[in-house]
Structures are given as C-alpha cells and as structure tokens.
Amino acid sequence: MQTPFPTLFKTAAAAASILIMNACSPASEDNAGQPESETGDGDSNAIAKAGFGETKAGEATEIYTLTNKNGLIAKVTTYGATLVELHLPDKDGNLVDVINGFDNVAGYEGEGNQYFGCTTGRVCNRIAKGKFTLDGEEYTLATNNDPNHLHGGGDKALSKQVWKAEPSADAQAVTFSLISPDGEEGYPGNLSMKVTYTLTDENELRIDYEATTDKATPVNLTNHAYFNL
C-alpha cells in the first residue's frame, strides 16, 4: 500500500525542549577530545570545539561542548547533527551523562549504532515498501529496513552525513546546516536544513529545526536520543 503525502511543505520548523533540573557547581569532567578552540569568557557560557575522528570516507568530524553558566554540559557532533552527551547533576550534585552514545565517530558508523542521538530524516520512522505518491507521481526510496524505508534510508540519510557547524556569538548554541540535493535517497527537491542546539541559562536543552525546499516533498525531522535515567 502506498503512503500518500498530499500536503506541500515549503517551510517546516519545529522546536523541542528538554527541561533540566537546576544544577549545583559540577566537578570537572573530561571532554571527548582535547579542545581546539573555545568561545566564551570562562565565567559563564562557553563552547569548546574538538576533533571527533574521521569517517570511513575520510571526512573530518568535530564535537562541540556547550556549558551554561550553571555548569550543565551538552556535547553535539557534526556527524549526523547528533547529541552525544548531556551531563546533569544526580541527587548528590555530581554530573552524570544521561545520553547513550559513543566516544568517537567510529562508534556512530559501527553496527551497534541504533540512531543514538542523531537527526533523522528526511522522514523519520518508516515508509512502507519505500514508496509514496505525491501530486500524482510515485516515488521510490532507498530501502534499509527489510522492504521499508526507515529514518531517511541508506548512506545518505541525514544521520550519516557530516553537517557544517556554526557556534553562536553568545556561546549558548550551535547550528548545524546541510543541503540534501534533489533525488537523494529517492526524495524530490533540494532540501536545505538547519538544526540548532541551545543550552540556556534556564537549564533547558532546546532543539530547533528549519527546512526549506524548492519542490513538493515530505519532511519530518526529529532527534533520536536514548536517555539513560
């Protein structure tokens, strides 16, 4: 049975917030890689950048460590615009990482990765038999879940691509951007996307999505984090 997408989305935007408990002053923790550069004044918000390894295709990846004025920490990587770590205080005030993930890009490219923390799409979830009809035209997608298309498909799924990163001037956010060309994984239209992770001073981790396309196409982006609480 075909999956219809009758609605044209020219612009799609969404926001997700994770409310985090108030933090005590944290003990220091090791970063995933040695910082290469840092934004911030050292007394409040800060963003540190470090290498995260090379992909199998030889592309360099980076990891960004966001720290808010209360000491909470979030780590995100250019590979898949992925949330790698989120450090929160436990009942004793000690920081613990509550996100399941890997220490480098090799882990995310391995067989054991079940979309940990990544940005999934162009369409998250399954499209039955890898087919859909839009405006009277049938499209055939890459299949990667038996006969179905799952979380954007194969090697060019958003979760498997290296995104460009831009830290914010206020050291509270990192914006990842990517352009998926017309026909990639079988989808119509050139799709330009931005995913922004913001760690606020109110102890919120916010994820904002923006997508624009030049052709009718389905878009349904999300984050696939696993929480170890």
Which sequence ranges carry the predicted segments?
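C-terminal motif of bacterial Sec signal peptides marking the signal peptidase cleavage site
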Residues: 20-23
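Hydrophobic helical h-region of N-terminal Sec-dependent signal peptides
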Residues: 14-18
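Bacterial N-terminal signal peptides that target proteins for export
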Residues: 2-12
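Surface-exposed acidic/polar loop and edge beta-strand patches at domain peripheries
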Residues: 3, 25-229
